[in-house]
């Protein structure tokens, strides 16, 4: 059991602390070449030497932390396709679902009415709405056409959501149209392309792209992602005890787990994609609040002002340094709660990140834990693996698993 608590009283103040430089001798950091200096890794020759050393040192299957380190040094794109982040893991798949419905999986489809008495549950599995569930409906891989469209729309949504609270308002849409039209009565497709597609290198907006040294430092401080890989499918969920953000309630995970499955969410204020997608998680909670428990653990900042800072955060009014005390983290969490208005309990991780590390929860991740306390679903690491629709389907199948089978 991981035990820690948040002070009952706290005050939200501006943060003036300075983030510490990463400790390159920490046992959590992969073994590094002698004399390794992140600042020198912006030189291709130095980075190539480090890659050569690491690939000799780590043969065979490599940990996620080593894969991420190699990806950075090789100059791979910061996205979900170039070995940055592993895919989600789930106990359920189409074969399991077909067996549950009494259908031969080789047929390639399951009539929706064979799945459950609840129409709502079946609808969430039938992603394309054609009345049956196919392997494509459950496919959340990067190459799936639906997933690619979701990613594109999510990026556009974030650029339209000016205050970055995950809620697009009429005022924001009106402002967007004015900016695109530039005084005209209308906006053309080209006007929107110029406005919405960043005029910068790569997939990052202006002022958001990191240098190689910054990526390395963010990895070593676990702002880019926790170095531990977290529990696997079928593992018992690591227990913990935390107070809610306002200090009024203490919650222990093992006492929440029981007849209902539990959705565990880990995230932070300075991760723009997490802010954009958080309301989707709250919407899932609203749909299943009588059938499942929902908890959020607030973890280490992904893009603090004294780390890999992003100009897009500053433009949205999100500018905080990395907290170095628990009180400061509670204060930043309070800013998150004021902006996002979460409807589920929000717990604050201890400043040395025991829960974030135990669940590999930085910068964000989703889990579904079944009624026996076992991991049924583990999302890919955020932001690219943070797929709320995928989590919801896993939750639906967890509910189906625990319910009486329908007579066929």
Model regions and ranges:
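Primarily EF-hand calcium-binding motifs
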Residues: 90-107, 116-129, 152-164, 170, ...
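N-proximal helix/coil linker or "cap" segments that precede and/or mark the start of modular domains
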Residues: 195-243
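Structural micro-motif
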Residues: 237-239, 260-261, 341-345, 360-367
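Thiol-/selenol-based redox modules, centered on thioredoxin-like
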Residues: 213-217, 350-408
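A short beta-strand-turn-helix
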Residues: 241-261
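Aromatic-flanked redox-active Cys/Sec active sites in thiol-based oxidoreductases
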Residues: 265-271
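Bacterial N-terminal signal peptides
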Residues: 3-18
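Structural microenvironment flanking redox-active thiols in thiol-disulfide oxidoreductases
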Residues: 273-340
């Amino acid at each position: 059991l991981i035990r820690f608590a948040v002070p009952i009283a706290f005050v939200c103040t501006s943060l003036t602390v300075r983030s510490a430089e990463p400790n390159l001798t920490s046992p959590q950091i992969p073994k590094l070449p002698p004399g390794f200096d992140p600042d020198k890794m912006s030189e291709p020759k130095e980075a190539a030497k480090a890659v050569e050393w690491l690939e000799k040192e780590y043969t065979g299957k490599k940990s996620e932390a080593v894969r991420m380190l190699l990806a950075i040094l090789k100059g791979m794109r910061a996205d979900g396709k170039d070995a940055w982040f592993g895919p989600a893991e789930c106990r359920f798949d189409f074969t399991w679902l077909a067996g549950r419905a009494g259908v031969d999986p080789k047929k390639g489809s399951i009539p929706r009415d064979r799945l459950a008495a609840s129409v709502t549950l079946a609808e969430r599995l039938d992603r394309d709405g054609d009345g049956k569930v196919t392997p494509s409906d459950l496919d959340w891989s990067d190459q799936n056409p639906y997933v690619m469209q979701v990613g594109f729309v999510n990026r556009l949504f974030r650029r339209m959501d000016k205050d970055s609270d995950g809620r697009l308002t009429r005022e924001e849409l009106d402002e967007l149209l004015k900016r695109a039209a530039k005084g005209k009565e209308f906006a053309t497709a080209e006007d929107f392309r110029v406005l919405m597609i960043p005029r910068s290198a790569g997939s990052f907006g202006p002022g958001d792209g990191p240098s190689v040294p910054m990526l390395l430092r963010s990895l070593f401080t676990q702002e880019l992602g926790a170095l531990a890989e977290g529990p696997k499918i079928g593992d018992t969920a690591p227990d913990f005890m935390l107070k809610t953000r306002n200090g009024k309630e203490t919650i222990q995970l093992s006492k929440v787990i029981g007849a209902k499955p539990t959705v565990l969410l880990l995230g932070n204020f300075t991760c723009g994609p997490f802010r954009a997608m958080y309301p989707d998680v709250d919407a899932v909670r609203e749909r299943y609040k009588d059938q499942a428990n929902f908890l959020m653990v607030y973890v280490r900042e992904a893009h603090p002002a004294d780390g890999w800072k992003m100009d897009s955060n500053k433009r949205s009014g999100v500018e905080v340094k990395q907290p170095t005390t628990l009180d400061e983290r509670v204060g930043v969490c309070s800013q998150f709660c004021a902006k996002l208005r979460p409807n589920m309990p929000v717990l604050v991780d201890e400043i040395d990140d025991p829960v974030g590390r135990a669940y590999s929860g930085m910068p964000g991740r989703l889990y579904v834990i079944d009624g026996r306390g076992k991991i049924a679903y583990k999302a890919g690491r955020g932001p690219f693996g943070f797929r709320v629709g995928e989590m919801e389907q896993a939750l639906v199948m967890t509910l189906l698993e625990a319910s009486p089978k329908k007579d066929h």
